[in-house]
From Swiss-Prot:
Native organism: Listeria innocua serovar 6a (strain ATCC BAA-680 / CLIP 11262)
Xref: HAMAP family: IPP_trans
Function: Catalyzes the transfer of a dimethylallyl group onto the adenine at position 37 in tRNAs that read codons beginning with uridine, leading to the formation of N6-(dimethylallyl)adenosine (i(6)A).
Name by which UniProt lists this protein: tRNA dimethylallyltransferase
Keyword entries, A-Z: ATP-binding, Magnesium, Nucleotide-binding, Transferase, tRNA processing
Binding residues annotated for substrate, in chain numbering: T13, A14, V15, G16, K17, T18
Gene that specifies this protein: miaA
Transmembrane segments: none
SUPFAM superfamilies found in the cross-reference section: P-loop containing nucleoside triphosphate hydrolases
């Protein structure tokens, strides 16, 4: 069976992935699968820079607004859903295009990636849940440094699961993770967008300003009023900082500046992930040749299939 060609567009937040994905979809008869772990949630629109129907410009998109914030959409679920979508899109004669910045989710699609399918120990999990996120992450770092490198301290649920698997199996959680062999079903072209660091940070700061103008405070306030502040999906950048403001522990300007700062740090982590974990063909973003260069790479890739 021939491998399914898939275009994958990755890069840090605010670098221009969405625009490029639309261009490629129009030129190569593609359909787009979102590779963003936050855009799957309904009601998280402004804070996740979710693509609008107008921006979709008639291109079919998947894995956007598929579940409520209180219902976790895990990497394992993303892997299963995306693999099914790739096959469906390909079988209809279209080109599957994945676009996003969630490295773990995207990588899981193309590599033989396990998720620690050990059974549960609810009592142990409750015990861990009483600890603060910093203590938990430090425990993981001592027991399994490789996993600690890949799981952010703020992802408390994921850190707890890693510790639970170690507790149950006696093996590092990282052993269940990536095997660096591509899944035989797919032939991906990984395109990465990069931008001068200062220019990227300027874009991020402007994007946050625009989010506030578009109503981010109101969007976060609705989630706050619905008592969703402890839901893992809501603890993402752009929401958690405003919850601190709603609690009276910061000013609105301080919350905005913290969102900008955290977004810049997140972009740096994204770039580190993609550069260290995936074999990516990098393209300079924000220049007149960005789209043309990407299209030439896709043409060459498809011609070789």
């Amino acid at each position: 069976m021939s491998k399914i060609p898939v275009i994958v567009i990755v890069g840090p937040t605010a670098v221009g992935k969405t625009s490029l994905s639309i261009t490629l979809a129009k030129n190569f008869d593609g359909e787009i699968i979102s590779g963003d772990s936050m855009q799957v949630y309904r009601g998280l629109d402004i804070g996740t820079a979710k693509i609008t129907p107008e921006e979709m410009d008639g291109i079919k998109h998947y894995l956007i607004d598929v579940t409520d914030p209180a219902v976790p959409f895990t990497a394992a679920k993303f892997q299963a859903e995306t693999r099914g979508l790739i096959e469906s899109i390909h079988n209809r004669g279209k080109l599957p295009i994945i676009v996003g910045g969630t490295g773990l989710y995207i990588q899981s699609v193309f590599y033989d990636y396990g998720f620690g399918n050990a059974s549960e120990d609810k009592a142990y999990r409750r015990e861990l849940d009483q600890l603060d996120k910093t203590t938990l992450w430090q425990m993981l770092d001592q027991l399994d440094p490789k996993s600690a490198e890949l799981i952010h301290e703020n992802n408390k649920r994921r850190v707890i699961r890693a510790l639970e698997v170690i507790h149950l199996t006696g093996k590092p959680f990282s052993e269940y993770q990536v095997h660096h062999t591509l899944n035989e079903a797919y032939q991906p072209l990984f395109l990465g967008l990069d931008l001068d660091r200062e220019l990227l940070y300027e874009r991020i700061n402007r994007r946050v300003e625009l989010m506030f103008e578009e109503g981010l405070v109101s969007e976060a306030s609705k989630l706050y009023d619905e008592h969703l502040v402890d839901v893992p999906a809501i603890r993402g950048i752009g929401y958690k900082e405003l919850f601190t403001y709603f609690d009276g522990n910061s000013s609105l300007e301080e919350a905005k500046e913290l969102i900008q700062k955290n977004s810049r740090h997140f972009a740096k982590r994204q770039l580190t992930w993609f550069r260290n974990r995936m074999d990516i063909d990098w393209i300079q973003a924000g220049v007149s040749t960005t789209d043309t260069e990407a299209m030439e790479k896709v043409k060459t890739f498809l011609a070789s299939k």
